[in-house]
Regions:
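Short glycine/serine/threonine-rich phosphate/pyrophosphate-binding segments
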Residues: 14-19, 92
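Nucleotide-activated chemistry modules centered on ATP-dependent adenylation/adenylyltransferase
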Residues: 1-5, 22-168
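Short, glycine-rich nucleotide/cofactor-binding loops
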Residues: 7-15
């Protein structure tokens, strides 16, 4: 009786596009397509999302992140010297998608990935939860130039404790 069975995070790339196709055609799901624009969209990705939506007749929700804040955070992470410099963008993706799902009572989030290109064995020192709001804010406080007013945040506790055990 819900409008959507799940949310699918879509970038416009092959992995999330293929996942969307399989979810709709093979598993007969009713996904809401969720896209986060953090300022790095290519025209090809935007065109791919449009074609996917048209072909599969799906709805799209796009969250646009404040580019100046994304830029400032990314520069702060570069200046900090940590190896996981892509955290600001990943953090925004997961924060917005999980919060949207939570507040719209959508219980499942699907994301596309590719083991052959995204799961190269990195040194353990490089591994870090992108959902660590405290580290994100600490790095920004030390190396950022602007105040974060609109940047979406989330925390490990919200993901690992609240959502699985306390969400009603």
């Amino acid at each position: 009786n819900k409008e959507y069975d799940c949310i699918i995070g879509v970038s416009g790339g092959i992995d999330s596009s293929y996942l969307t196709y399989i979810a709709k055609k093979q598993f007969k799901l009713r996904p809401l397509i969720f896209h986060v624009d953090a300022g790095w969209n290519s025209q090809i990705a935007v065109d791919n999302i449009g074609k996917l939506l048209d072909h599969l007749e799906l709805d799209l929700f796009t969250e646009v992140i404040d580019w100046e804040e994304v830029r400032d955070l990314q520069i702060a992470f570069l200046k900090s010297g940590v190896s996981h410099i892509d955290v600001p963008q990943d953090h925004a993706f997961f924060a917005t998608m999980y919060k949207y799902a939570h507040f719209h009572n959508i219980n499942y989030i699907l994301t596309g990935g590719n083991l052959s290109t995204e799961c190269i064995r990195n040194p353990k020192e490089w591994m870090y939860f992108q959902s660590d709001e405290r580290q994100l804010r600490d790095i920004h406080n030390k190396f950022g130039a602007k105040k974060l007013k609109n940047f979406p945040t989330t925390s490990i506790l919200w993901h690992k404790l609240y959502l699985p055990y306390f969400k009603k």
